[in-house]
């Protein structure tokens, strides 16, 4: 399981994130292929190794001649819908631009569909978004933690005139997200950067406990005095926190019930050892479910991320558990020529339980054209042979 931490203490922009991804080992070809799929005109990603504030960094130039710099949210949506992109890349890119459109509509008092993107509607910004989300999908990061975001100070020239930093759209995008001015007297977080960070983030804060494999350092376009204009991307695996199993839970009352099987499957895929639903009655008499997941502490970040991505919850509870598990062993029994696995459980060396694996029983029953109950009874009887005398099955 891959986890990532974004150090945005010097701000964030699309090209800084692209550079950090390349520096962290994502092939430029992966980013270029995603950009080519969506761009209606040629766009080239050119990588350059530079220094910012004395630090070595990767600068990713997005080179384009764009004949239509102003596009609506509908225009961008059409481009992405028609692009030959993987569904997860397309979905993330759409979420980034939807977030941008919603923020712009909020600050200008209009609707998202009426928003005319200016800087972020240009092909270079579309390339930034598509390339960055393709890069993170390539990394396979199931958890992305973002540091408090430095936004800068002063003023910035935009299509709407001279605006204070952070400009209104950035301030709206970062609503509820840890941010601060920082040392720079310039804009350090762009709308594209803010939208990308807030879409990709599964958590905010300092670097989580992790074993770091690669570090990418993405360079901004300017090299101001006083601070390195870079964004750092740490990629690795979660450190084993040594805290044993955790129970993660949340209450959900507004999710289509048809989605729950996919949610449970996603949590198990993310690393949960078990996941289940409990019907509950919430305040105001509203029927709901408690979603519970049991997970080792070292894999909890990915399961947290899956819960937030797969459900409508905006918070979850977490508590450490003490788990007592018997030693287990798998053996095989034969029922009319069909091999059925039986799980043995030992306590102090004695086999105290033996249970057939139901999937094997169901398969054998289908192959033998016999009732499942009959095959199960035979498998249980054969499993008894493994019990230590005097113990139960």
Curated annotation (Swiss-Prot):
Pfam families referenced in this protein's UniProt entry, alphabetically: Ni_insertion
Species whose genome carries this gene: Nocardioides sp. (strain ATCC BAA-499 / JS614)
Chain segments annotated as coiled-coil in the UniProt record: none
Gene Ontology terms: biological process: protein maturation
Catalytic activities: Ni(II)-pyridinium-3,5-bisthiocarboxylate mononucleotide = pyridinium-3,5-bisthiocarboxylate mononucleotide + Ni(2+)
Keywords in alphabetical order: Lyase, Nickel
Signal sequence, start to end: none
Protein origin, superkingdom: Bacteria
Enzyme class (EC, first level): lyase
Lipid metabolism recorded as keyword: no
InterPro entries: Ni_insertion (IPR002822)
Family: Belongs to the LarC family.
Function of the molecule: Involved in the biosynthesis of a nickel-pincer cofactor ((SCS)Ni(II) pincer complex). Binds Ni(2+), and functions in nickel delivery to pyridinium-3,5-bisthiocarboxylic acid mononucleotide (P2TMN), to form the mature cofactor. Is thus probably required for the activation of nickel-pincer cofactor-dependent enzymes.
Molecular function (Gene Ontology), one example: lyase activity
Stated name of the protein: Pyridinium-3,5-bisthiocarboxylic acid mononucleotide nickel insertion protein
EC numbers on record: 4.99.1.12
């Amino acid at each position: 399981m891959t986890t990532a931490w974004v150090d945005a203490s010097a701000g964030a922009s699309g090209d800084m994130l692209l550079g950090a991804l390349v520096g962290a080992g994502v092939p430029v070809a992966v980013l270029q292929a995603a950009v080519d799929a969506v761009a209606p005109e040629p766009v080239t990603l050119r990588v350059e190794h530079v220094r910012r504030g004395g630090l070595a960094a990767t600068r990713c130039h997005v080179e384009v001649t764009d004949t239509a710099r102003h596009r609506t949210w509908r225009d961008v949506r059409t481009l992405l819908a028609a692009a030959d992109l993987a569904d997860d890349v397309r979905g993330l890119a759409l979420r980034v631009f939807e977030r941008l459109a919603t923020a712009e509509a909020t600050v200008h008092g209009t609707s998202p569909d009426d928003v005319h993107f200016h800087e972020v509607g240009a092909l270079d910004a579309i390339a930034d978004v598509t390339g960055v989300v393709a890069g993170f999908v390539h990394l396979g990061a199931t958890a992305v933690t973002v540091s408090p975001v430095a936004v800068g100070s002063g003023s910035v020239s935009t299509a709407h005139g001279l605006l204070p930093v952070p400009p209104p759209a950035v301030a709206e995008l970062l609503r509820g997200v840890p941010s601060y001015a920082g040392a720079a007297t310039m804009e350090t977080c762009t709308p594209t950067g803010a939208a990308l960070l807030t879409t990709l983030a599964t958590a905010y804060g300092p670097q989580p406990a992790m074993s770091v494999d690669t570090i990418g350092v993405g360079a901004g376009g300017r090299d101001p005095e006083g601070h390195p204009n870079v964004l750092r991307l740490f990629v690795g695996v979660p450190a084993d926190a040594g805290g044993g199993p955790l129970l993660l839970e949340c209450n959900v009352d507004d999710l289509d019930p048809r989605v729950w099987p996919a949610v449970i499957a996603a949590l198990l895929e993310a690393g949960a050892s078990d996941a289940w639903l409990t019907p509950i009655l919430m305040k105001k008499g509203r029927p709901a479910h408690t979603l519970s997941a049991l997970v080792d502490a070292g894999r909890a970040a990915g399961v947290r991320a899956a819960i937030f991505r797969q459900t409508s919850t905006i918070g979850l509870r977490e508590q450490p558990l003490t788990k007592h598990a018997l030693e287990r062993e798998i053996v095989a029994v034969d029922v009319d020529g069909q091999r059925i696995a039986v799980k043995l459980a030992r306590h102090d060396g004695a086999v105290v339980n033996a249970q057939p694996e139901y999937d094997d029983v169901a398969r054998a029953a289908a192959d033998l054209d016999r009732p499942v109950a009959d095959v199960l009874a035979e498998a249980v009887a054969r499993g008894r042979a493994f019990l230590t005398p005097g113990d139960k099955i």
